[in-house]
A protein has these predicted regions:
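S-adenosylmethionine
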Residues: 1-326
């Protein structure tokens, strides 16, 4: 009943009749054939009156939002405590949308205006991103990897928020940059664009098998400033001590800020998140040792939980008086 009602009320591409028929068949398949008549009658009634249904009582706010937007109740309660009702509901609704495909222009090969025209020639509509410079939103791209602009390295598929990391870092040509949790390489590539591929970027990741993707991406984009390196970002490497002008720590996290990109993230258990701040703190503490005097340390995640963001950086600043928040 709940699956069918959801399809009828919230999914535009599923005809009401299909939602009813499928739900009836599911009732029969699940061994509840005696309930199929009830399922049929209730769902048909909902379909006939879906514009005049009374509002659902919200005696349990978190439970209501959990059902309405298909998120676990523990997460909804946490979001309500962080964001408040209005912003939390907007966040939950956005998580059920399909994110636009966003690419960053490779300024070493082309510019936004030229790339927009070239993509249009391939039947792809491209528009400048509304708030991230150097990025485009694409419509009708299909398999982007088959298009010449992709194969020729004129663009990088990247979420706009990831692009912000290199902008915030303010990297400059000729600098030395360490990307401590680099795979699959997007932030390293973005930094190389900003540095005009001049300088040194060490792209480190714990998983050696992921370095191949960084190498392949750098080759496609014709970037020569990037050197992949395998290693645990929590383990000190003396040869890197105070060596880098900028160190990027895009720490492993719960991923609760990218649910619409990775819908399965919403089904993580609350207990799974407890160890993450320990890992994040260890990465940040170790990364601090690699920053040259006067350098920049950037900490980023793709989550909205304070335990993984503000609380980690606040604790770090308490222990490292030689750093300050910019």
């Amino acid at each position: 009943l709940r699956l069918g009602a959801y399809q009828i009320l919230y999914l535009d591409r599923v005809p009401d009749s299909a939602a009813v028929n499928t739900s009836v068949e599911l009732a029969k398949i699940s061994g509840r054939g005696q309930a199929s008549g009830l399922v049929n009658a209730v769902l048909r009634k909902i379909a006939q009156n879906k514009t005049a249904l009374p509002p659902i009582p919200e005696r349990d706010e978190a439970k209501y939002l959990s059902i309405r937007y298909s998120h676990p109740k523990w997460l909804v309660k946490r979001l309500l405590s962080i964001l408040g009702r209005e912003e939390a509901e907007a966040f939950l609704a956005a998580n059920n949308d399909t994110p636009p495909l966003t690419v960053q222009v490779n300024p070493l090969k082309t510019n936004a205006e030229s790339l927009i025209k070239e993509l249009e020639g391939w039947g792809v509509k491209a528009t400048p991103h509304p708030w991230v410079p150097g990025c485009l939103e694409l419509t009708g791209a299909g398999d982007l990897t088959t298009l010449a602009p992709f194969r020729e390295g004129k663009l990088l598929v990247q979420d706009p928020a990831a692009r912000l990391v290199s902008l915030i870092a303010g990297v400059q040509p000729g600098q030395k940059v360490l990307d401590l949790c680099a795979a699959p390489g997007g932030k390293s590539f973005s930094a190389a664009f900003a540095m005009e591929d001049k300088g040194e970027i060490v792209s480190c990741d714990l998983h050696k098998n992921k370095l191949k993707r960084i190498q392949e991406g750098a080759a496609r984009l014709d970037l020569t400033s990037i050197t992949p390196s395998a290693g645990d970002g929590r383990v000190f490497r003396p040869e890197w001590a105070e060596r880098f002008d900028t160190v990027l720590v895009d720490a492993p996290c719960s991923g609760l800020g990218i649910i619409r990109k990775k819908p399965d993230v919403r089904y993580k258990k609350a207990d799974d998140l407890f160890t993450l701040p320990v890992i994040q703190t260890a990465l940040l503490d170790n990364a601090a040792q690699y920053v040259a005097p006067g350098g920049v340390l950037v900490y980023s995640t793709c989550t909205i939980l304070p335990e993984e963001n503000e609380q980690v950086t606040d604790a770090f600043l308490t222990e490292h008086s030689d750093f300050c928040r910019d």
